[in-house]
């Protein structure tokens, strides 16, 4: 005998979402929750977390409050299997899956001291500055990820930004505005509810650098974003003044 119990889960991530719990075999049919990118044929044995993280933040991420509501509904259930609409059936490590969904849906970082440096460079000078900062931080023993927004699929960049507790944005100025890859990245972060992070800024612009001001304006529209005081402002290639600014930014990034 199989008995199904239906649990509404609106906006995870569609308005009409409903999950089902099969009481005999303890199976949760979770709809879009606990899904993962990747075809079963090619990624069946791949670790669940990286692609589940990317799926969560890019598909469900905006609806953290609704995910929290679903987690409360299923908290009293004994679950032996999770069957999502996307990705593999889950039969192992379910406690960790639930723990991560609780963390992700509260917009908390998995690694609070890790830093993502996301850069959008036109001719390479901004990218060089980003890589220089990475080297300085790694000498301090900091875990650093770096992402070139001009070539990286934004879904990976977004997932990495949420994974880390700190973010450094490095962008060239373009026609008096933000270089489009950085502008699009910030729009994606805002759409997915990016919050609770510490952020540093690097800008570049030969005549009138404006990227830092524009990035700050966009970040101030997000919740609980702490901006570091030091801004590295380049006018082309990295120089001694910028090196001093960068050392000050490194000190701030490592102080908390």
Per-region residue spans from a language model:
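Short, charged N-terminal beta->alpha structural module
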Residues: 118-140
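Catalytic core of the metallo-beta-lactamase
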Residues: 1-45
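FMN-binding flavodoxin-like domain, especially the glycine-rich phosphate-binding loop
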Residues: 40-82, 86-89, 132-147, 157-256
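Conserved hydrophobic helix-helix packing surfaces used for dimerization/oligomerization
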Residues: 4, 27, 115-117, 199
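Short hydrophobic segments within beta-strands
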Residues: 30, 85, 118-120, 202
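Short N-terminal or domain-adjacent regulatory/targeting segments
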Residues: 83-111
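Short gly/ser/thr-rich secondary-structure transition/capping motifs
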Residues: 9-10, 99, 147-152
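Glycine-rich beta-alpha junction loops
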Residues: 33-35, 86-89, 122
């Amino acid at each position: 005998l199989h008995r199904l119990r239906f649990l509404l889960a609106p906006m995870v991530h569609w308005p009409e979402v409903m999950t089902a719990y099969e009481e005999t075999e303890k199976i949760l049919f979770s709809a879009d929750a606990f899904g993962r990118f990747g075809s079963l044929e090619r990624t069946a044995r791949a670790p669940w977390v990286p692609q589940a993280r990317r799926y969560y933040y890019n598909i469900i991420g905006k609806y953290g409050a609704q995910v929290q509501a679903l987690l409360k509904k299923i908290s009293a259930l004994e679950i032996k299997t999770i069957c999502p609409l996307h990705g593999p059936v889950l039969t192992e490590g379910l406690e960790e899956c639930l723990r991560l969904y609780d963390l992700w849906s509260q917009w908390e970082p998995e690694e609070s001291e890790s830093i993502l440096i996301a850069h959008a460079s036109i001719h390479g000078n901004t990218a060089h500055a980003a890589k220089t900062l990475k080297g300085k931080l790694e000498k301090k023993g900091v875990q650093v990820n770096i992402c070139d927004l001009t070539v990286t699929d934004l879904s990976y960049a977004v997932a990495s930004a949420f994974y880390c507790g700190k973010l450094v944005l490095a962008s060239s100025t373009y026609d008096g505005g933000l270089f489009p890859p950085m502008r699009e990245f910030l729009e994606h972060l805002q759409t997915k509810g990016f919050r609770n992070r510490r952020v540093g800024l690097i800008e570049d612009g030969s005549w009138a650098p404006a990227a830092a001001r524009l990035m700050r304006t966009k970040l101030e529209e997000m919740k609980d974003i702490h901006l570091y005081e030091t801004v590295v402002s380049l006018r082309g290639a990295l120089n001694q003044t910028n090196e001093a600014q960068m050392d000050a930014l490194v000190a701030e990034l490592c102080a908390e």
